[in-house]
Structures are given as C-alpha cells and as structure tokens.
Amino acid sequence: MPLAFTNPGTPLKRTAAYDNVQWNQNRILTFGTRYTVLIIVNNYESYQNIQFGESIGAVALDQRTGFLAIAHGQVLDIYKPADSLKWTHHYNYITQLSEDITQLSWGYNFDLLLCASSYTKLINFSEDKPRLVWSQNRISDSFLSSTISSDACFIASIETKNPLAKVWQRTSPQGTVSSCDDFSYLVHPCRVRFSQWSKHLHPDASGSTPFLSTVGYDNVLRIWQVGSRFGSQLMHLSCFLNLRKYYKSDQPPYCCFIDKDDFTIALAHAISRHSGQVHKDRILNRLLALASGQPHIFLLFTFECLYIFSLVIDQETLSSFELINQVPTNFPKGALQPDGFIPIYRTSKHEFYDYNIILFFQNSAREYMFSLTDFFYSDFELRVSYDFYGHDYPIKSLTRTSNGHGIVSRDVNRICMFQSYISQDGKNQLICRFRLLLGESDFILPLYAGEYAAVLNLNSLKLWHCNEAIPPTLLCTCRQVPTSPIITFFILPVQNNDNSALCALTEGGHAWFWSVSNEAHDGSAVLRFIDRVNFTKNLNIASAVDVMGWSSTLNLSSLSSFDQEVFQSISKDGLLQTWMARVLGDDKAEISEISKVQTSIKSATMIKGSTSKKVAVVSENNRRLSIFDTRSSEFSEKEEFSSVFDDYGPINDLDWTSTPNSHSILAVGFLHDVILLCQNRRSYMNDIPCWSRIRRYNLLEYTNSLISDSSWLDNGTLVTAIGNGLFYFDNSLPEDQSLLFPASLKRSAKNIFDLAYQLNGILPVFHPQLLQQLLLRNQPFLFTNILLRFYLCLKDDVDMHFLLNMDCSEFYCCDEEISKDLLIKSLSQNSAEILNPAELDFEETSVSKHLGLYIDEMIKKLTALLKVKKVKTLTRSSQFLLLNLIEAFNKARALRDSLDLNGKRYCIMLNQYVLSKHQRQLTSLPTREMAWAFHSSNKAVLLDHTKKLHGKPLLWNAVEEYAIPFWLNEQLLKDVFLELSRNHYAEIDDRNPENVSLYHIALHKINVFRDLWRLASWHKESARTVKLLSNDFSKKKWKVVASKNAFALLSKHRYFYASAFFLLADSCYDAAKVCIRNLKSISLAIAMTRVYEGDDGPTLKRLINEYVLPLAVSQNDRWLTNWSFTILKQEKKALQSLVSPIRSLVSDNDFIQLYTSDKNDQEIHENKDSQRNSTNEPVRNKFPSDDPAFILLYECLRSSNVQIDESLEYRFVLHNANVYCQLGCDLIALGLLRNWKFQKNPATAHLETEDYMVTDKQSAVEKTHDSPKLGKTLMGQDIRPTPDDVPEFNESAFSFE
C-alpha cells in the first residue's frame, strides 16, 4: 500500500519558492506552499514534506551537493540529503534582521546568497559557524532579486524601479576568501521584470560559461555574456529578442530556457523510445540536425501558439536567436502571469514525455508535460500530469461522501474543500470541486455524489449546491436545529436517488432528523425538519457507523428485513450501545437499541463502528484500543481485541473500511503512524490473534507534520490528512518492511483486499482445518473422498479448485451411506491410480469388498507424497498439520470398531495434540478433548491408546497433561494410581517411599506403604515411619497424630508428603487443598479425591463447587463446566452449560469473584511484562471461547428428559453456523443449518431474526411478496451484485508457522 499521490497544498506563486536540479542522477523538484516545503524526487519515487511555523519565503537546491536551503521569515534552515533520498535538518540560521528573506541562491563550497528587500548577503556554511563572505545593502530601491551564477563567479541583482541591473564579479570563488569589489551596470531602457542565470547540466565543466537573461517591462529578452567588447564592462549585451513581436501583450511573457546539454540528453531519451528506424523519422532527423549546433532552446508561449527559438552562445562571435518553428498550442487560459521564467525540467528516461513545465493558477499549480517531437507536429499539446493544490492551513478533519468517491477536508481556518476521486491517464487523483468558508462550529456533510452539501450549526441547517463549474449556491435553509452542542452529523444508510435523511446527535442524548428531497433534478432541493427523538440520557460520545461496506454487505431487501446499526454511543461508565435509526413518515422518526455491551472502559475518548458490527473504542488516555463484536450473543465473548500502543503515541483517529467480500479493515492513526488492523479467520489448529496488524505507514518518512485525520475511499485508497496536505495510499501491498503480517514478501495477495480474503475467506476443502471439522462431525467418508481427489490433483500437478470440483451437496448430505457410495464410486474410477490389481493376493478386486484396503493404500501414497512435495496453496505449517491430521485419522481408523463417536473424536484430537504439541508449545491437553473422552463409553480403550501414544512409563506429569483424572471412571483411575505408585517408585535409584506416599494412601494400601518404608532402611526416617504406620488410623488418636505430622511437613515445604498424611488422617478436603494451593495441581486433588472417596464422596462435590466451577467461570470454560455439572449429576445444568452463560448457572459469586480478580491481577502482571519486552503483540491475542464443537456435544447429550428453551437452541444453532463461517467452513455451516433436527419445532414467534444472528457471509433473505419496489442505490451508490466466483485461496507464503 505505497504512497500513490499527494495534495500538498496550494504552491506559492513565486518562482523564488520553486527550484529543481539534476543531482546524483536524480531529478529533484522542490517548491513551497504557505507553511510547507515539498521535495519530489524522480516523479514521486521519493517524496518529503517539511512543515514550518512561518510562511515560506524562498527555497534553493544546490546542484553540486544536493543541499536544500529554506527561508521562512527571518530564519534560514538548511537540509542535507541522506542515503534514502530523504533530507535531514543540518543547520539553522537566524538573520537577526527584521526583513524576510525573499530569494536564495547557492554558490560554490556551501556559499549561499540571501536576498531581502534591503540587503543581499553571501554566507558560507562549510564550517560549524556561518561566515559572512560578502554583503551589499540597498542604496535607493529595494532588491527585487539577487542570484549567483552557476559557476559561482558572478552575482546579479535587480531592483524594483531601477533600469540598471548590477553584476558583481567574485575573485577566487572556490577559495576560502573571496571579494566582490568589481561590478558593472547592465543598462536597460526600462525597469527589469526578472532575470535568470543559465542553468548548466554540468556547471563545473569546461566550456559551461554562464550567461544572464533579463526581461524588461518592454518585453524584450536580453542575453548578457561574460566579458566586454567595447569597454571594461564585466558583461556585455550579446543579443536580444523582442517578444512583443510574438506576444501581443504588456503582461509578463510565458517563456523558459532549455540548456543545450539537457536538450541533448532529452533527445537521446526520445530516440531510445523510438521503435522504428531513426533515419526514416523526419521529426527526429530535424531534432538531430538542431542538436548538432549545440544550441540553447528558448520557448515562448502565447495563448494560441508556441514559438521555438535556438540560441547559440559563442564567445568569439555575436550570439543570435533563430526561430526554429511555431506551432499551435492549447496554452491554458487561466494561467497567472509569471514573475520569472517558467519552471521547466526534464523527466526521467523511463517516462514517455521529455519535459515538464509548471504553471500557476488562482488556487493551484499544474504540471504539464510535452515531448520534443511535439515541436514539429501540427499541434503542440500540453498534457496535465499533476495538479498541485490543497489547503494553505493545517487540515482539521475529513468527511467522506456516502459512496466513498470523494472527501471533504476542512482546515483550521474554516476553509472546506470537496475533492472527488477520478482515474485519468492511468493515474488516480482527487479533483477539487468547490471551496466553502464555514463557521467555527459548523458541521458539513456531503450528499449524494458530493454535488450537494449540508451545513449544520446551532442557528440553521443550510443546503448548498456545489458544482465545479460555478461557485457554491445556497438552495434552502431550515431553522429547526438543535440548541445543545452537536456531537456528530451524518446521513442515514438508506436513500434513493432523489431523497435522503440526515441525523444529528447532541450532548443531551437527542437525535434530530431532516429530509432532503431533490425530485426536480434541476439543482433545486427541499430541506425539511422531521422529528426529534430522545434515545439516551447517559451519553459520553457517539459516532455514525462507517458507511464503507454498506454497498457490498447489504442490499435493500435485507434492510427491509433486518435492523441495521446506524450509530453507536458509549457512556462515561463504559456502556457501549448500538442503535438503529430510521424515518417512518413525514413527521416521525424512530431510534431503537440493537445491542449493548458493558465494557470496562471508563471515559472513552473515541469510538467508531463498522458495517460488520465491530466497534473500536479508545481508552481515556488514548493508548489502549479495544474492538468489540456487538453481534456477539450470550454464547461468546464480545471483546475480540485489546492492545496498548505505547510505541506510537496517543491514538487520534479511527477509520473502518469493508472489502468486497465483507471483511473489515481498521486504520488506527497515531501522531506519525497509521496501523492497519485486519480480522483473522478463527483457527482451530493454531494460536493466532483475532486481529492482526497487517500494515504500518510511518509518515515520518514523508513529513514532520502530525496526522490529524484519515478516511477510506471505496477502492481501498487511504487518505491521510497531515498538516495542510493530503496523502493517498493505494491498496497495493509493497514488498518492504512496512508489511507487518504476514511477514513473508512472496505471496499471491496483490492488495489489502486480497490479503483480507486470505486471512478471512472460505477455506479450500483440502485445508486441514476444514477436514478436521468434518471428522469431528462424523463424516469420514466425505473426508476420505476429499483426500482421494486431493491426492490425484497433487500427483498430477493439477491446479486445485477450492472445491476440488466436488458438488456442494456432498457437504450437507446427512446420509453416511450416500457418502460411502460416492467414495466407492470415486475409488472405483481411480482404482488403478491407487492399487495395482497384479499386486493383490486375491482375485476379487471390487472396491466395495476391500474398501479399507484401498483407503489404506491411498492414505499411504498421499502421506508419502506430502512429505516430499510442497502444496502450492498451503503454508508449510498447514501442510504439516494436514499430514498430522491424516496420520491421526489413520490411527483412529484402526480403532473404529472399538470406539463410539466421542471416543473417535478423542483419538483424532489426541493424535493431533501429540504430534504438534512441541511445535505449538502446548503443555496440556485442552479440556475440549477431555470432554470427548469423558463422554465416551470406551474409556479403557482410550486409556490404552493414550499410553501407546505417550510411549513412556506413565508418570504423574503425563497423567495431568492428558487430563486423565477428569475423564477416567473410578475403577480405571484406581488402576492408574496403582501404576503410578509402581512407576514413580522405580523411577529413581534410591526408591524413596515418600514419592509414592499419596498414591498408596489414596488406594488405602497403608500396609504396602509401610512395607516400602521398611525396605528403605537406608533412610533416616525409616524406623520412625514404620512404627507410626503400624498404628490403627481408624482411631481418632492416630488421626490427630497424622494431622500434626501433616502440618509439620507443610512447614518444611514437603507438600506432597503432607497431603498424604492429611489423607492418612482421613481429612480428604485438607489433602486436596494442599494439592491445589501448594502443589498448584487441581488435577491431583480431583484424582486423589476420586480414588480415596469415590465419585459420590462429599469432598469431590465440595471441590467442584469451590474450585472447579469458579475456575471454569473465570476462564469461560464451558467444557470444564459441563464436566462439573455432569459429575454433580445435574444433567440439566450440564446441558445448559453448553448454550447458556456460565455465570447464570453458578450461584456462589464469592468464589467466582475471587478467581476472576486473581486472574485479572495475573493478566495485568503478564501484560506489563509483555509490554516491557515487546509492544508488537496485542494484550489479548487469543480467540474468544466460541467453539463449534459445543453443538456436537450438545447434540450427543440432549434427550427428551432434559428440555432446553427452544428459542435458545435456535439461536445456539445459528451462532454455531456463524462460528463455522468464521472458521472458513461455510459449507459445514450450511450443512448444520440444513440438517439440524429440533426435538420440538420452535414457535413461530421465536423465529424472528435478530441482528446478531446474521453472519457476514449469510445471504440476505429476499421478500417474495408484499414487498414494495425499492430503488437500486444505497447511500447514493449503485448496489453491486454478489461476485459470481470466489477468489482463489492461497496462503502459501504466509508466515503462520
């Protein structure tokens, strides 16, 4: 997304504020606006904008060194070039005089000539302290200009009313000391308008003797050469040209010189562009003949014709002008009279045209281009290449048109400028349509395509007709306006070509509505007040939803069916609300609350919402940005992103845009940077953030001004207001370090819209995330069929369509027999590709008879191919996960006859966990996988499979890692404890019984434990412990002794042993508390309690109520909550925990608050550490707790005995379909919606669709009857149809590893 173009402001209409040089093989152009200086290198190859606090007086570039001198007021600043063609500040010089510097001119060895009205000075800046070389004060008239020649030997000055131009000669201009004692007068018959030294391409080369050109008020061009032919003058009049002969006006002429060397190079470039034979081209031959005499070219423009003269400077003979040609031209009529020679410079060799000239107009300066060959065509055409215009004062705000085709910018001096976006000659730029002077408290809103503007203040609402051909015209005024301060002013989202509705929000929580009617289409319009509505009493700030995206995400029928968010507000205490606003009639409007979120953000300073129902909120200190999903329901978290931006300074701007595929991108503006945030596809397989920073603009590369506002155009161009200029960044992606994510530069995404689709779009069916969901949904035959097609495409290097040419109906087919038949059919058609019949040891080769064999062989070949061949459209990480998933599936197939559905799910997810835990740095099996095993009836098989995957003797760390205490039944858990006691005892050489104490005592094997201590005779505690364990601990006396020993062990930090002695004292709860508080293992507490007391014991229930449930609530862990209620035999709550807010199911809020506060304190501590180490990662970078597997478990557990509210189940299904879409599995979402079977059909009243049910990718429901015919525009823009084809998915170079 590089810089496309800029509007720097209106250039100063003085040639002294403009300069260009050819330096270091680069063409450098610089000019000043009122408060800024622009530096443009090689036609915007590099661009820089430097802002000052005072008006710019003059600029000058040193052709030898590239140094830039800038005069503003009585201050002179010098900038030096850096390696990256940027200029850095080098020196600051104050003249100590009251007059402003009006002209600058560089000499040799950092000599700089300063000119003001009463003096001219030559100062040397080669040393640390400036040194005055020479100065001259005015005698009579003020200095008009003072310039130094290209060889630095002569200084020429002209005065305002003096017909004498004065020339000083410098002695030893290249030395450290020089004087200008020798001078001469150049006599003119009238006052001199302007003068110019010849600018040579190589000023220090031999033969580049300078000459001086002057134009007097008699419009005669005079050429003055060095030396005297008739006396002792320093210069003499070599020749002259009477311009009045060609230019019939007393006004200053439009003329310029082209240096002879520069002309030769430009001609060489013109010849290099010629595709045919040069000697056959008549025009090129004429130019070659002209260049052979090494002339300077003089161009004289009139409004009808261009005159081309040649001037040969010769020291031996008299010089003369020769008219080469005159050609009709289209010289612009509105160009202002020049105060010097027209600025002209050669273009780079890669451009089609040879030269550019700059002409000044009333509110702009335009760059025109032409070719040398145009000199001899029948018509000379000046083509506009750039229009320099803009604000003279810093821009305060930007307001976008509703269709995104233009913006209105407003500066601090209340000048408002409307600019519309156009594409001309392959270049994109904004054209200024009108300017309007506003009041101090006015709000402006462009209407339709920008040809109308509404201006609102506390006195009136005015409607202006704004056309670029005529000045803005006031059409009508409405006096019914708010009396309290206005917060925001916006247009309602639905309008047609003739009517629109306006809305203003005030600090009192009121909304004012007006209508604008333009049915006559004759430039007239009617403005009418509609209604005032009170929508809230607790209002801090409010803003309209960013309209970029309405045209691509909604159509009019959807707006008639659903309530669309129009604006959002937030209170002082952090209550975020979104509102729908609409006009019901001629005098009636309505505002309804759509959603509300209680945030923890107090006194927010900024909010901005998108059409995809995302709202960005900035904290009170302008450092923290949070993004909320207002569409989120009770099933998910609402805060998706929160990050502190300390490195970039305070946040001062937010702006949303929507891609053609309805993905949101947020531009966050800081002092000198703009960060683009894009939402990520939810990931089931990688820990990636919900939102990622995909692009950073460091505006310090271009300017030292501060960012004031930014706005998106509809084509993805980001317009940023900085100082008095506008910067336009197109939607392309540069291959540089400014691309923050993905980090790889080699990618298929060409612009930010493509990148947003890669991060959010539909996944191909062979992506491991989609395949994993198919397995979880028990669609193994469809899974295998996809693998087969994928294998055939990969083997033959066939381009892979994202559906692999499969029928969509296969994905929502709920009959596994049909899926099996389709798989058999595909295998039969490609059986020779998979299995050679000659290799079989049986005669029957039917696929249906040996389906397992064919599948095994296909998987074997696909796995081998994936290990050696790169899949073009997958990342290395995704390809690894695909291999992982295939291997997990293959292992689960071996157990398919021994497992139920949940057992298969556990095996698949366990295999994936084991294969990827080191890469993902996982330390424990997620509670989701624990739930699959817990609800399986084949726990013995699962335990055996887990041990095999672990591949080592089972120790406690492994038991805790795989959450075995939670999902094994009581008897199997006792067997595991017995195995742990053996393995831990044999683990170390000394065989210390203390290491297995808890296991034996939990198993009530005190005698075995005593025998182990008897064998440990080497231990100093052996005898005493054996004696102690020989007592009867069923008696109260010995329970007290065991308890005292437990406390003694606690004081010595021997926690494991202490827990065993609490258990020996029959204090199971105390033993569990030691495990939780001291050993930090709630798993050990649960396991020990279940083994010691059984699942029906009181301690387990107490632990669940006091520790497990509060922990689950604090972490929003529905899986753990479901497990807890199932153990507690509360079946209804267990089922509700999958669909209802967890807090509503837990009554003991004291423990919840305890865990929540502890968690928040820990997060704050971790966040501070992470910010101290790196500020490049968001504070909250995990996905919300939405998981489509909830509905899979819900489907397994629901029964006729436990009834769930029908409307709640309905919303739950829709929510999970939305989550599937966010995972990129839209086809699975469709299958869920098509195949879901309600136990009882929901009532019609419960089928009303709510906003949060609508997904980004859900098609709008078209009304088939009783629907009025609506227009085809939205926000004044034609509604675009849904794309016919989906962009190809390619994540091949994303750095997701």
Curated annotation (Swiss-Prot):
| Keywords attached to this entry | Cytoplasm, Membrane, Nucleus
Free-text disruption phenotype from the record: Leads to sensitivity to a range of drugs including doxorubicin, camptothecin, cycloheximide, and bleomycine, hydroxyurea, and fluconazole.
Basic and acidic residues composition bias: residue spans: 1161-1171, 1260-1269
State where the protein is found: Cytoplasm; Nucleus; Endomembrane system
Q: Name one GO biological process term.
A: late endosome to vacuole transport
Q: Name one GO molecular function term.
A: protein-containing complex binding
A matching Pfam family: Rav1p_C
A GO CC annotation given for this chain: cytosol
The UniProt annotation puts the region (Disordered) at 1161-1182, 1260-1297
Spell out the subunit comment: Component of the RAVE complex composed of rav1, rav2 and skp1. Interacts with vam2.
What the protein does comes down to: Component of the RAVE complex which is required for stable assembly of the vacuolar ATPase complex V-ATPase.
> What is the protein name given in its UniProt record?
Regulator of V-ATPase in vacuolar membrane protein 1
Source species: Schizosaccharomyces pombe (strain 972 / ATCC 24843) (Fission yeast)
Q: Which gene encodes it?
A: rav1
